[in-house]
Amino acid sequence: MADTNPNAPPRSDSLLNPADALKYLEEYPRGDGLSLQELMDSRKNGGLTYNDFLVLPGHISFPASDVSLQSRATKNIVLNTPFLSSPMDTVTEDRMAIALALHGGLGIIHHNCSAEEQAAMVRRVKKYENGFITDPLCLGPDATVGDVLEIKAKFGFCGVPITETGAPNSKLLGIVTGRDVQFQDAETPIKSVMTTEVVTGSSPITLEKANSLLRETKKGKLPIVDSNGHLVSLVARSDLLKNQNYPYASKVPESKQLYCGAAIGTRPGDKDRLKLLAEAGLDVVVLDSSQGDSVYQIEFIKWIKQTYPKIEIIAGNVVTREQAAQLIAAGADGLRIGMGSGSICITQEVMAVGRPQGTAVYAVAEFASRFGIPCIADGGIGNIGHIAKALALGASAVMMGGLLAGTTESPGEYFYHEGKRVKVYRGMGSIEAMEHTQRGSASGKRSILNLDNAATARYFSEADAVKVAQGVSGDVADKGSINKFVPYLFTGLQHSFQDAGVKSVSELHSCARSGSLRFELRTASAQLEGGVHGLNSYTKRLFA
């Protein structure tokens, strides 16, 4: 009589040998899930966003700490962390740019301010950390304590070399420090309080040797002089501490200064703006437009390449291969992808133009990769999972606005709304941003019409009598400091890569292209299942 017990174990003669499981796996014609190409077939699946799919897990054979997140923001700029901050006036000024660069990313300073203000912010970023400071701020012997205090108020330090002419490349007479000017009257001459017995390094000298000498002498600053006693450069102890505390900091290899980016428009006046930014030491310029495929941007790229060949150009925004091709052909060093996907953006709703971000990132990044052009996924990044998915789709880095808004380093003051500590966060297409009239020195009718406003320039609406909003203004909760938030993103992304079975961004891209990295579409109920559910109440702590 046949065994009808449903709980009985299967007969051993019907089972395969467990030791051969991997061999039998090869008999399946295809792996679980979908390849990237199958997933992103928009003719079959439509336009997809980050929440519409998942990356399937891979094989783990390494600790998460072994994962490298090094990637390119442009053809020639390598970041240790694939994070950029958005050039929005409630997200990125010099504090954000410094903090993000120290953690391996890149801050893009907004341009909804005067050119002089923007250049000053770039200069503060570039002066924050150095290897050899080849153009140190100097004072002459006739300067006063008040001059030193002014430097401290403006740049945050007061260790200043004193030279015969008050400039580098002249004879070093001494150095003045914070202790020298304490309790001194502002009118006191520097020559009466400066230290004249100065420990120096002799040029030529390696940075390693200079840093070693700085540690041995326990001084705050080490002037480097030539055989004639002329000041050649300066090395600072504060930079040694920054190197120790921020090992992933993104720096220019030659100067050891932090990388800094800034946004500009594509109007004639922006040529003068870029001149000031270049003089301040700008590394990369972002051409800021909601729709980058314009004759204005194409001509501007060509002009920048001729005038400032050492400045990298991130062009955009684009969401199609056709748009990307125009900017790549013009000479762009990187592309910014996204149109209407940001949390404060309503372009798709109002203009009926744009593209779901997942599909846009895949289409543009796949095309641009053939030319070696890195792509930045801009918009729709709400959590670590979105970052991982954007990179899996082919992006080399992500640009974040709302995710970084509300941090200590973002512009603006905290206030309380309905009992929560918040900061203002607004889209550059919002009416509030378009009505901001402090970008340039414009006044009168020009200021009233917002003819020199970054937000209106971004959306090609400077001369419009009626402003049509493509963004909103609101507030976001206090997220604390970048110094805790970015390490949380970094570590979480390392664990995401570990779960996928890849050890680097380049390996992630390679596996996605080859089909070994697999994906799965998510239904609405699958998305619901993947979030917190079934609880009466809960507390969502992101990191500790």
From Swiss-Prot:
It comes from Cryptococcus neoformans var. neoformans serotype D (strain JEC21 / ATCC MYA-565) (Filobasidiella neoformans). NAD(+) binds at residues 288-290, 338-340. Catalyzes the conversion of inosine 5'-phosphate (IMP) to xanthosine 5'-phosphate (XMP), the first committed and rate-limiting step in the de novo synthesis of guanine nucleotides, and therefore plays an important role in the regulation of cell growth. Its EC number is 1.1.1.205. GO terms for molecular function: IMP dehydrogenase activity; metal ion binding; nucleotide binding. It is an enzyme of class 1 (oxidoreductase). It catalyses: IMP + NAD(+) + H2O = XMP + NADH + H(+). Gene3D superfamilies: Aldolase class I. Residues 132-192, 194-250 form the CBS domain. One of its GO terms (cellular component) is cytoplasm. Keywords: CBS domain, Cytoplasm, GMP biosynthesis, Metal-binding, NAD, Oxidoreductase, Potassium, Purine biosynthesis, Repeat. Homotetramer. The active site is at 345 (thioimidate intermediate), 458 (proton acceptor). PANTHER family: INOSINE-5'-MONOPHOSPHATE DEHYDROGENASE (PTHR11911:SF111), INOSINE-5-MONOPHOSPHATE DEHYDROGENASE RELATED (PTHR11911). Belongs to the IMPDH/GMPR family. IMP binds at residues 343, 378-380, 401-402, 425-429, 470. It is found in: Cytoplasm. HAMAP family: IMPDH (MF_01964). Pathway: Purine metabolism; XMP biosynthesis via de novo pathway; XMP from IMP: step 1/1. One of its GO terms (biological process) is GTP biosynthetic process. This is Inosine-5'-monophosphate dehydrogenase. Its main location: cytoplasm.
